[in-house]
Each structure stands twice: as C-alpha cells, then as structure tokens.
C-alpha cells in the first residue's frame, strides 16, 4: 500500500495552532480523551478558580501550561484525569470593580443604591471576561471542563460552605471575638493574616517618625536635677499618639536617666531611654562630665550626661502627663507598664501603647488594667478615635454628652475629620503634607518631641486596594485554626512540595506561626455567614444546609416571627439546578430572615460575609455539593484528596493554605498530595509586569504571532517552574526557530525522501541486532530519553523533561544522526541499510511526537498524525515505554565521546578561522586510562570524519608533550574552605602534572592545607593546557585534545575541492534543481583551481552529480565565486540528456 507523508512549504505554528484546535473542537477531543480512559484509575486534579472580572494575563499561561502538561502526561500514562474549571466570583476584587464602574463608594450602598441592586451588578460584572478566559484556555491548549464549571456564587456551592462552617461550629472551632485585626479603610473590611501575607503586601514606605517626650509626673530624685523629666518613646505612626494610654518597658532592660537639652529649642531636660539605644540618639562625642548651663540648637553636637540607671521593672507604675489631651480615657491610664515584647533593636526601648491600634498594645494594656482611649458615637457605641473610613471621628458623629463631659473640643476640633493617611483621602496626594507631620510640628512647638525624621520602613497594604491597612478593634468571627496547628504541620509533612523549600520554608513557617483565621468581612457580595443570634447574644444557631434553614423559617412563621416562608416554592432535598434557582442565599435576601430561638426570642443573621478565601479553599467539597451529593465519591477517595495541584507562589498563604486548613479541620487530612508552586512571570528586565508601566505582555497577541507551542515550550523549559521567569519574546522566537524549526526540518527531510522512495512505515521491521551501529545508537539514546522524560514528568519536573527532548532532537537526532546518515537516504535502491535508516528515523520522530505532546500539544498532534496517516490524536495514545533491550550504555558513551571531542576540535578550528571543509593532518589525545582510549578508538573513524582530520594519535601524558595548568574555582571552594582558601588556592596552582592527571582520572584528589583535610572534585577547578607551536590545545573535564593546524599544499588543495563542492551545491539549490538532477559544470581556467580539479576531479563530479566537469578559457553567463585569495567564474546548468 502506497501513501505519502505530508510536506509543507514552511513552518507556521500559529496556523498549526488554529487548524489542530479546530479539529479538537469539532471532534470534542477532550471529552474523547476522558471516554478513552473510562474505568481506568483516576488521577485527581483541582483547578484553582480565577476571577473572570479581569482579563487573563501572560502569567496565567505559565500556571496553566504546568497544569496541562502534568494532566496530559497522566492521561497518556493511562489515568482518567477529570479537570473541572472553576470561577471565583465573590469578594473585594469584584466589589471594588463594581464600585468603580458605578462611581460609588461603600458608604453609598444601602443609600443611593440598594444592596439588592448592588449585588445584582456584582453578579453581572463577575463573569464579564468569561469569553476571553475561555478563548485563552482553548487557544493555549489547556484541557479543562469549562462547560460544567464550579461557580462560587452558586447556591449549591454556598450550601456546602455553610455545611463546612456548621461542622467547624460543632467542633468548637468557630467563635466571635473583639480583637485588634488588620483593617483596610479603603476596602471597608477586616483582613485575615493570610491575606496580609500575600506577596507584595508588605512594602517599604517613607513616613514621618518621631521620638516623643512624655513628661514624668512623679520623677525619681535623680531625674529632678536638670529641667523637667521625660520618657522618650519612638513611633512610626504619630497619628496614634492621641490614643496613647500607657508606656511599656522591658522588665530586665537597663534604662538610663540622661541630662541634656531639647535639640530644637535648647530647653534643659532629663530623658529616660534604654541603655543599648543611647548612641542612636546621642553622639558619643557629646558626652560630658558636667552638663553645661545652656545649649544653642545651632550647635550640631548635643551635650549629655548619664546620671543614673534602673531596670525596667523599677520604673513600673510611674506616671506621666497625657501627651495630647483631647480625650480623657478614665482611671488607670498614663503609667508605665512592663511587657516581654519590648526590644532594644530600634527606637528608645520604651514603647508607646495605644491599645486600640495594636495587638501587642491591646494585650499588654488589658493585662495591666490600662484602659483604651474610646469615644462614644451618636448611636451610643464605644469607638476608637479613628473611624472605619480611616479618619479622626468628625465631631458631628459623636455623642454630644460624651463630647462635653470627656473631650477638650477646641483642641480636638482642629483635627476632627482628618484622615490619618493621605492614601485614604481622595482630595490628597502623596506630596501633600500628612497628618503625622502636622502632629509632630504641634508637639515640637509644645516641647514634647525630641526627634522628628523621615524613615523608610516596612508597612502592610491591602492586597486588593494597594492602600495601607490599620490595626483596628473589630467585632469578628474567627476560625480557631490554632487548635489544629499541630495536625496541619503534620499533614504538611506528607505533602510533596515542588520545590521542597516552599513547603518547609514559606508554608511550613507560616503554619508554625499560625494565628486564628479572621473569617468576617463587612461587605455585601459574598457568602453570608450562616449564623443567627438573639440581640443579647445568649442564643444562636449555625445553619448547615438550605433544608435546615427552610425548616427553621417554617418554625419562625408558626411562632409569628415571619409572616410567610419566602422559599415556599423550594423543595428541600431536591438538588437540581432548577430547584435551587428558586432561592438566593446572598444578601439582602437572607438578611430578611428572622428565626425563632428555643426560648422564643427573635434571632437575626450576623451581617458579616465570610472571607472569600474560604470559598476557594472549600472547592474540593463544594464543587461536588458535598455532603448533599457525591458523598461516596468524596469519602472513598475517588475525587478527594487531589493527587496534584499547581498555582503561583503567591497562593502559598492563600489558596494552598485554605485548602490545607479546611481539609485538616474537616477530614483530618490535607486536600492535596503534590503541589507545584510556580514563580512569578516578570518582564525581561526582571520587573513586575503591569499595564500602568506598559510592560505587560498580551497573551493573545503572543499566541497569534508565535503559536501556543513555542510559548508553552519556552515557559516550561526556560527555567524551573518555581523560579521567576524573565519573560522575553526573543526567547519564544528562539524556541520556535531552534527546537520546532529543527524538528520540522528533520520531519521534512524524512517526508521528502520517504515519498521519493515510497517508504510507508508499514514495511517489515529490520531486527534491532541487524541494524547499523548508528541506528542502534540513536535507538538506544531514544529509549534512554523515554526513561528520562517519564522519570522527570512523574517527578513533576517538566523543565528537565522538555530540555532532555530538546537536546535529543537538536543534538542527537538532527545534528548527529540525520547528518551522518544523509547519504544512506540518498542511495539509489531500497537496501536493508536504507530501510533501517527510514525505520529508525520514523520511530524516533513518532516517539518524540508522543514525548513532547504534554508540553506542546498542537504540533505534537500534527506531527503524530502526519507520521501515522491516521485521524487518531496523539493525546489518545499511551506514553512510550522504554525497551531496555535496545539500551546500550557503552555505545552511548562512545558516541558521546565522539560528540564531545568533535565539539572541542571544531571550537579550536573556529579560534583560528579554519573551516571544517579544510582537512588537517593530525589530532592528538592523551587518554587518561585504557578505558577512555578504548572508548575513543571505537568511534575514531567517526571523529576523524566529523572534524576532517587525517590521523588521530594517542600520546602518554607522562611524555610531557602537553603541559597543563590548574586554577581553583573560588565560588565553589570558598564556602567550603573559607578560612584556608588563600592557602588552598596556592596549593592548587602548585599541583604537579602527575597530581593533575590523578585528579582527572579519579575525579577527586585529597590534600591537606594548613592542617585542614581538603577533597577536590574535578568541578572545583579549571584545567587548561598550554598551546605548543603549530598546535592548539583544549580541555573539558578529564578530556584533552591537541590539533595540528599546519595546512600543507596538499591539504589546501583538498580543502578547496570540498569548498567548490559546497558552492556548487548552493548553486543547485538556488537554481531549483531536484535532488536527482544531473548537471554540466564549466569553470574559468585558474592556476590554483585548475590544479585542484585535476587532483580531485572524480570526487568533485560525484559529489555535485556532474555529468561533465570542464575547464575553459571563457565562461559566459557564469557566477563569480569568491575564494578569499581568488575569484572563480563558474557555469552550472541542468544536463539535457
């Protein structure tokens, strides 16, 4: 049976992308791949849900390429790999986008726009870019079920979330507490600690800081000898100073009383600060035995005298004057307390305590009975001085009675309504003067500040608004994750992390310092907290299902708490989409439900939503509507836990953590076994991509220009997935050209000659043992490659797998096997040798198409179908298995030796600009042992042919013909032998020729340097050989080659003959001649070339397929060829005969 292999004019991977994708879509190939594995063992994969309210970026291609590679690989290994897409539809990203598009703020919700209208807008907006996401998913070849995705706003999804929360409630892991929490005024909600620890949340900012002077009311005698006495306390947040109610010292820290002057006004003062920090505020040159009577602030050197010292515990209980007396906090304030958290790393060793704005402050104040400074608003609620918008409470929002009784209104009114950070004030920019500056200036005028300076420090920002957070007292619901901390740590030890350092480092340390999870969010669009409480909080219920809530509503109707059941048309226990579409579990619908407590009191829902990260972390359960549906599948291990997940490193304390935490608390296990944490995709200069900076890369344009395969191959093979990728389209182009171009050209070569010779791929196979050595070598390498790629992909190392394939295709298959076998394909008849060459190349290409399929699915499929001639996709095929009987390690090593030696010799040729077509006389190699010599001898003819050298001579190193020098690698040896490195370097460079030979032969060498045992490895040094006259020498590892570069007249003549052949072959190609066409060649007589043709006539004629090769005194219509020393006119025409 005859068949033709498809041939192409050029490689257009973008077109291949489109054509193969169209075929997949038409034949629903993804679905077919699942059907083909029906009944096979399952490989469980979880897709992290992106939000479709924003466009996908190039970094999404990276994460999805990793996921798709592993899932395709596992499918080819015989597993059924279900991949369910998901959409993250709740939370701040959506709400902030809607607020921006509607031109409103959070404060407008419920006023100018109803909660129902607002949430309806959120529901519409959240799926705005679904088509773009689906388009990118298809175009990049990511196989995932987008027709049946899990959607976090779906009522059935929310029902599972409620069930999970009810389970946590039953276990005593859900509680309400009033604590200091991270709070985002810009977003209007509290944040969890894992949200605050997203990459980039902590940023260096330049703020005004000050060392404030707190006047001591009961100074010790030593403090009364030089002006008023003050405690010095440093703060990076001067806006918190009006809320100060205590100063905290370390009980065992030593504190000094120092006589000095205020550096701004020269007023004599005595200050108290920690001894270790004395010289951060005072120049040692200013210390004096007697303090002068006065000081001029114009002088740079501030005089000071240390007069006494005490332990911090001896200062406990001392009282001081309120620094900024706007509000009277009541009894127990303005005294010194002790705390173990106080350090002397910076500041003054005395910490200013504002209990309403710091967790440590709140804890130590409560322990010492120090009250927080609170205001009472018009509703009668006690509030901190800063409101939820991030500003000092406007006086109009406060209880007039409280203002009159407890506040100094004239002083407070100057700053009332001022935002504590310019970022919260729409009318201010970063350049405007901040509240901190104004407060510091005020204190300076009052002799209440010792130092004011700008300082860069690390400050937390909201992960979604990019604006600073505050630490703020909030009434929130928490998950008691700390109760399961040890179990989470133990479960983490069972997870296979790629890289391991993320699991033991970033993730492991996070678990070790775990804090309870702040679940509450004061927002509108999200999963409502399913807790109903009485007004006094004495009775409450945590609802765990829609059916339970339905029944509780029925009870409330009977008790007269509600007029009717708003879910009257809903049928409990019927889990269809149509039934659940009759209800809405979002606000404001659930807010209007009032339940009846066991004692007959009304219970209303706690208005908070839950953290959106709980939504995504619950997806292993919620995507299955567990436990209401699919209970058996979840509990028997069919769909839980995941065998594999992968997302960006930014999810380490996000999705990875919430998946792990929820599963540990609910099921006692982690929800995933293997996780690949990929790095960031940066621009080519290493900067973060952003539309604002104009350095973002459009994934759609990139795929359109290059095709998905080069993009995916570049991303996978450029660096390990967990390393940051400096994305450069030049790299994508290089992959397209070098890897795909080489593979395409190899296939084109095969198809061209296979079609000429009628090879079909169905001929009886030549037995492996009967095939020539070159065939057995490439098949051995191919089977070694299969094992390597299989091992690497099974170990979640796609980078190593891809690089191994690239190396095989470019170096072994194309540059070595095909090049060395070309003449076999050109031979006339279909001999056994020629058939073996075809079958070997066919097998190699077919196997490569399968190996590369997980990484580059489009071209692999095209190549596979072109080779097989069948309509079946490579993605339905099984992954290749190595045939160990065809693996010959000795043959591989010999050929590798030939490749290495050839590469070294060709590099020497390039050094002196000697073309390979120019024959040379001698190559000299000092073999380090008999085994290396035998290895080289087995491929000696091949080496000589490759490098175009007439003779290979082996020499003994001990003959002294080649002299070697050795240098230490400081980067490798320094960390191991730092203390003796200088002496070691001298010892290495002084090694004898015999010692160098010993190192090359054994791979290691032991010596003792300055009493320290040293073991050198070959990689620890650089060995170079000195050139000898007329020769060039090169070293690589334990291999040395020396090349005789003398060109005799005889050698030059042969070189010119080869050069002429090459030039004529180029003319044949440019003239469009077929491979089989004969030609007539006429050369213009030339002294040099006449002699060359005479000496090598038969060789030249055979190589260029010349029917006639003649020299003439005149050549018409010829081509001029430049041979450096002369120009030759030549005429090449197709033979007419």
From Swiss-Prot:
Swiss-Prot/TrEMBL keywords: Aminoacyl-tRNA synthetase, ATP-binding, Cytoplasm, Ligase, Metal-binding, Nucleotide-binding, Protein biosynthesis, Zinc
Motif ('KMSKS' region): 688-692
EC number: 6.1.1.5
Subcellular location: Cytoplasm
Co-factor(s): Zn(2+)
Motif 'HIGH' region mapped to chain: 50-60
SUPFAM superfamilies cross-referenced by the UniProt entry: Anticodon-binding domain of a subclass of class I aminoacyl-tRNA synthetases, Nucleotidylyl transferase, ValRS/IleRS/LeuRS editing domain
Binding site for ATP: 691
One MF annotation (Gene Ontology) recorded for this entry: ATP binding
UniProt keyword Acetylation present: no
Principal location listed in the UniProt entry: cytoplasm
Top-level EC class as recorded in UniProt: ligase
Record GO biological process: isoleucyl-tRNA aminoacylation
Reaction it catalyzes: tRNA(Ile) + L-isoleucine + ATP = L-isoleucyl-tRNA(Ile) + AMP + diphosphate
Top-level taxon of the source organism: Bacteria
InterPro entries cross-referenced by the UniProt entry: aa-tRNA-synth_Ia (IPR002300), Anticodon_Ile_ABEc (IPR033709), Ile-tRNA-ligase (IPR002301), Ile-tRNA-ligase_type2 (IPR023586), M/V/L/I-tRNA-synth_anticd-bd (IPR013155), Rossmann-like_a/b/a_fold (IPR014729), tRNAsynth_Ia_anticodon-bd (IPR009080), Val/Leu/Ile-tRNA-synth_edit (IPR009008)
Protein's UniProt keywords contain 4Fe-4S: no
Cellular compartments per GO CC: cytoplasm
Role this protein plays: Catalyzes the attachment of isoleucine to tRNA(Ile). As IleRS can inadvertently accommodate and process structurally similar amino acids such as valine, to avoid such errors it has two additional distinct tRNA(Ile)-dependent editing activities. One activity is designated as 'pretransfer' editing and involves the hydrolysis of activated Val-AMP. The other activity is designated 'posttransfer' editing and involves deacylation of mischarged Val-tRNA(Ile).
Domain comment (free text): IleRS has two distinct active sites: one for aminoacylation and one for editing. The misactivated valine is translocated from the active site to the editing site, which sterically excludes the correctly activated isoleucine. The single editing site contains two valyl binding pockets, one specific for each substrate (Val-AMP or Val-tRNA(Ile)).
Family affiliation: Belongs to the class-I aminoacyl-tRNA synthetase family. IleS type 2 subfamily.
Quaternary assembly: Monomer.
Annotated PANTHER family: ISOLEUCINE--TRNA LIGASE, CYTOPLASMIC (PTHR42780:SF1), SOLEUCYL-TRNA SYNTHETASE (PTHR42780)
Protein name: Isoleucine--tRNA ligase
Lineage: Bacteria, Pseudomonadati, Bacteroidota, Bacteroidia, Bacteroidales
